[in-house]
Amino acid sequence: MVALLFAGAFSLAFTLFLTPLFIKLFHRLQWGQFIRDDGPQTHHTKRGTATMGGIVIILASVLGYFVGHLLTWDGIRFDPVTPSGLLVVFMMVGLGFVGFLDDYLKTRKQQSLGLGGWQKIAGQVVVATVFAVLAITLRDPVSGLTPASTAISLFRDLPLDFMALGAVIGTGLFIVWICLIVASASNGVNVADGLDGLAAGASIFSIGSYVIIGFWQFNQSCDSVSSYQNEYRCYEVASPLDLAIIAASIVGALIGFLWWNTSPAQIFMGDTGSLGLGGALAALAILSRTELLLVFIGGLFVIVAGSVVLQRIYFKLTHGKRIFLMSPLHHHFELKGWAEVTVVVRFWIIAGLLVAAGVGTFYLEWITQ
């Protein structure tokens, strides 16, 4: 619990007080945002705003996680980091690097396209594949559990284990499943990062839910004394408290960053931030055994990304007609006349309600066992 509080407080202070220094540095490096001419006219004033703020978020989150553990030192030992926590860090940094390459190419070429679509997907697949292999190979030193399970999960593992099809086929399908989750979550956050503060605020709700879920799973762990009388309710999750610690560190970093990212934004997170955050969200869901619950917890990202898919399919089927004035969905409402801040706050409300529904059903499953 102490590590959780220290991690969140450190990362919040880091982004809140040091982001202005990074803004100056990024301007000096000429890392400014490129704005497309065919976007909403109100966005043209954003041209040149410092981007790649995801570097600040990721740096603060990682440092906060390790500092949180170091500050639990009692003169003899400190709470050790775990494979689960390190895997979340790996996913966030790995996808953040893919996003950084995309952002860097955009700023160098001064165009909206950095990496090609398939190049970006390839990077996500490589990171997700390494994550998947490590997640079923490493073992928690205390519980002996692997960080991830090869079963599909909702509130806990479902009786749908890929390994029932054999080790080779099962492992292959598990890797494909993980790649699908990672690509969906990271691209979902990436698509939502189109208005000042939208992705950062929504991510606070989504990733913040894993502080609650991780801490609850820790208290109801099958390894804890309190769960012996409720063995059918307990959770077989490796290092759930450490998942809560890294989630708290990310949330703290996002809150401090949002101070500078809210309208009018002085810095954007860029693909560095959005892909990294989406990767962290996917990793938290996979390692906490709540993969399918992402439909609620990442509900806003599902809606926004879904609007892009629907627009493209409808456009092709009708030979040029559109459902929305512009996709993603938040730009549709901008073109309808909504102020940017209005769209952002209302989308935050939707994100918060969907996260509440996700956490609520998670708890409801426990009390009805």
Swiss-Prot record:
GO terms for cellular component: plasma membrane. Coiled coil: none annotated. The chain crosses the membrane at residues 3-23, 53-73, 81-101, 118-138, 162-182, 198-218, 240-260, 267-287, 290-310, 347-367. Keywords: Cell cycle, Cell division, Cell membrane, Cell shape, Cell wall biogenesis/degradation, Magnesium, Membrane, Metal-binding, Peptidoglycan synthesis, Transferase, Transmembrane, Transmembrane helix. Pathway: Cell wall biogenesis; peptidoglycan biosynthesis. The keyword Transcription does not apply. Its cofactor is Mg(2+). Its main location: membrane. GO terms for molecular function: metal ion binding; phospho-N-acetylmuramoyl-pentapeptide-transferase activity; UDP-N-acetylmuramoyl-L-alanyl-D-glutamyl-meso-2,6-diaminopimelyl-D-alanyl-D-alanine:undecaprenyl-phosphate transferase activity. It catalyses: UDP-N-acetyl-alpha-D-muramoyl-L-alanyl-gamma-D-glutamyl-meso-2,6-diaminopimeloyl-D-alanyl-D-alanine + di-trans,octa-cis-undecaprenyl phosphate = di-trans,octa-cis-undecaprenyl diphospho-N-acetyl-alpha-D-muramoyl-L-alanyl-D-glutamyl-meso-2,6-diaminopimeloyl-D-alanyl-D-alanine + UMP. Its EC number is 2.7.8.13. Belongs to the glycosyltransferase 4 family. MraY subfamily. Catalyzes the initial step of the lipid cycle reactions in the biosynthesis of the cell wall peptidoglycan: transfers peptidoglycan precursor phospho-MurNAc-pentapeptide from UDP-MurNAc-pentapeptide onto the lipid carrier undecaprenyl phosphate, yielding undecaprenyl-pyrophosphoryl-MurNAc-pentapeptide, known as lipid I. This is Phospho-N-acetylmuramoyl-pentapeptide-transferase.
